[in-house]
Amino acid sequence: MLEERNRKIKEHGKATRERRSSMNCRVVSVKIQENRLSKAKLEKLYRCFLEAKWLYNAVVATETLSLEDTSSVQVKVNGSFEVRLINTLSVQMKQSVVESAKQNVYSLSKAKKKGLKVGKLKFKKECKEINLKQFGNTYKIKSHNKISVQKIGVLVVNGLEQINLDEVEFANAKLIKKPSGYYIHLTIYSNKQPQEQTEKEVIGLDMGIKDQLTFSNGVKVNFYLEESEQLKGLMRKLSRQTKGSNQYKQTLNRIKKIFEHQSNKKNDVVNKLNFVLKQNYIICFQDELLNQWKRKKSKRRFGFGRKVQYGILGRVKDKLKKNSTNVMLESSVPTTQTCPVCGCLTKHSLDKRVYHCNHCGFECLDRDVHSANMDTFERVWNVSLVKHGCG
C-alpha cells in the first residue's frame, strides 16, 4: 500500500516537472496587512518564526540532522536547557525547517568540494523565512485579497491583483519576516507568450567611479543613495545603548527598516533600467572587480568604496550577467588603454579624463565613452561583434 502511494507521488511529481519545464516561472511578493489581523493571528505569526528558530537549532545540534519527535525541543537558556512546545508550526512547516538545515549542510559540502574554506553549520539567532511547500494544503488562495495558511488562518494581503488567478499554476510559497512586516512570496508558473524577434542594437558599457554607467552612445547613468541624517543619528544612538536590551532591539529594527527602504529604491531603479536594456540592446561589458574598488582608500569624503556602496554597480552587473545574450570581457582586458584606430596601448592615470593615443594621435574627449566604444571592444577581440551577433 505504501509502495503504491509512493509510486503515484513519484509519477505525479515527474509529470508536473515536465509540464512546468515549458512554462514561465516568476515570484510574486504580497504583503500581509497586519492592521487587519486579530491579536491572536499576529501572535501566531510571531510564534511561527520563533518556533522555527527553536526547531532549526535543535536539528543543527543533532549529529544526524533529524528529530524523531518534533512536538517539543530543548532550548538553551542561561546555561541550562528548557523544553519548549512546537504548537504553531504545521507538520509540513516542520518538515520544511528540517529540510532547510539539511540543504544548508549540502550547500556547505558543495562549497568545500570546490576548494572554498567553510566552517560548520551555525545556530540561528533569528529565523526569517518558512517554506509553505504545498499549494492547496499548506496554503490556499481564498479570494482576491485573502490567503489561508495552515495553523494560522486566513490572512488579509495586499498585492494579489498582480496575478491572474485563472491563468497561473501555483507552486510553493515562502512566509517571510522583514523589518517592515510580514510577506508571502508566491512561486507561480504561466504559459509562455509568443514574442516577436526584433533586431537589437549592440552597445558597449563602461563601469566607473565618476560616472557609474557610461554607454558607447554617450548616455550616462548615475544613482547614489547616501546615508540620511536620521540613519546616522540612529547609528550613534545604537552605539550608546546596551546590546541585547529592548531599546537596543527597537533602534536596530528602525535601522533595518531604513536599509530595507533604500535597498528597495535601488532595486526599483535597476529593474527598470534592466528592462529597457534587455528589450532593446545587446550589452558588451567588462567584468569589473568591484570588491577591489571597495577596498581602495581615498582621502575624499566620497571615496571609491562609498561610491560602490551607495551606488547600483553591483546590482546592474548581476542583472547583465544573467542575460545570456550579453557578452562579458575578462577584467584584465585593457579597454581604456587600447586605441580603436591603431590598436596600440597607452596608459592613462585616473586623473586624466581625456584619452590620447601616443602612437597615432587619436583623441577622445571622454575616456569613459572611449572605454565603452564598440570599436575598442572589436580591437580587443579582433572580431566584428555586430557580425557575430555578440551572442
Language model segments and positions:
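Short coil/turn segments at secondary-structure boundaries
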Residues: 61, 71-74, 112-123, 246-253, ...
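Positively charged, helix-rich recognition surfaces that bind polyanionic ligands
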Residues: 3, 8, 25-28, 34, ...
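Catalytic micro-motifs at enzyme active sites that drive phosphoryl/nucleotidyl and oxygen chemistry
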Residues: 18, 171-174, 189-195
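Gly/serine-rich nucleotide phosphate-binding loop at the start of the catalytic core
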Residues: 2-99
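Ordered hydrophobic segments in well-structured contexts
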Residues: 29-31, 146-148, 169-174, 181-187
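Stable alpha-helical structural segments in soluble proteins, enriched in small hydrophobic residues
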Residues: 59, 96-109, 369-380, 384
